[in-house]
Amino acid sequence: MKIHKCAFCGADILPGYGIMYVKSDGTVLRFCSRKCFVSAVKYGRNPRKLAWVRKRQK
């Protein structure tokens, strides 16, 4: 089984979990939670500027 990384926060996503979003150009984005999905797709937020994101650069 393959473990994927969240496209927004970088967390590990186990098989059977998370949200898979396919853009109109065919790009596949995988998210660990609805919070990450909405932040990235709906609001277009930058993960580096949010305190709760794990892959935030300090």
Curated annotation (Swiss-Prot):
Q: How is the cofactor bound?
A: Binds 1 zinc ion per subunit.
Q: Which cofactor does it need?
A: Zn(2+)
Which keywords are on file for this protein?
A: Metal-binding, Ribonucleoprotein, Ribosomal protein, RNA-binding, rRNA-binding, Zinc, Zinc-finger
Q: What is this protein's function per UniProt?
A: Binds to the 23S rRNA.
Which family does the entry's similarity section mention? Belongs to the eukaryotic ribosomal protein eL24 family.
Q: Does the keyword Protein transport apply?
A: no
- Print the organism lineage: Archaea, Thermoproteota, Thermoprotei, Thermoproteales, Thermoproteaceae
Q: What name appears for this protein in its UniProt entry?
A: Large ribosomal subunit protein eL24
- Native source organism of the sequence: Pyrobaculum aerophilum (strain ATCC 51768 / DSM 7523 / JCM 9630 / CIP 104966 / NBRC 100827 / IM2)
Q: What's a single GO CC term here?
A: ribosome
